[in-house]
């Protein structure tokens, strides 16, 4: 029987995932505590707009797609204290709050780290410095898509990819919120209609087309797995796809996905919850 094998949220966009025993799905369809902060380029410290919603394209801030070395950092966020702690190679780089002084210190440390990485030239492009740490540390708002969504993939799909690659692939490369076990490989790509995780009801939306972030080793930050070309050339996909987007249901249909929308029921999903679909 398909069930939840692992749950993740990513408090700071592009940085260390936090493994959880349970996650709260907010009425707006986003995961509480997921992507509540982001390091943005100077020219992109305010949101763009898409379909009437705030949109924060990952190409305009620190993200693994362009800055794979970020994966080598170990970042933790204390939501109650509003405090960010960043470590590298067991060395504490910074431990600061989200007040004005703390945000400046965090941005300074991240800037220094990236400028000392192989991707340093990318950060020196016009309009990118100084970095800005944006977000209130509470509202989930920096997902890749304006509408938010919950992301899910199956362990079997990752195992099939590992076989085609000839090396073991870590689930964390895909930065999904929900990892399921007990389903056949690639089943999630064919889901239609309602998907239920525990007591929370979703509607299956589009499959997730992957980017270069998946090439980065989640421990070292080195691009050591050609995930995209393996999905297309070896596994025959038209686009490099792994995983599915889920939209929270409401009595009126799907929620809008706007930050703070309260039309959905929300709820809690837990490791071990049964997953039904179709």
Regions found by a protein language model. Name each.
Residues 1-278:
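Metal-cofactor-dependent catalytic cores
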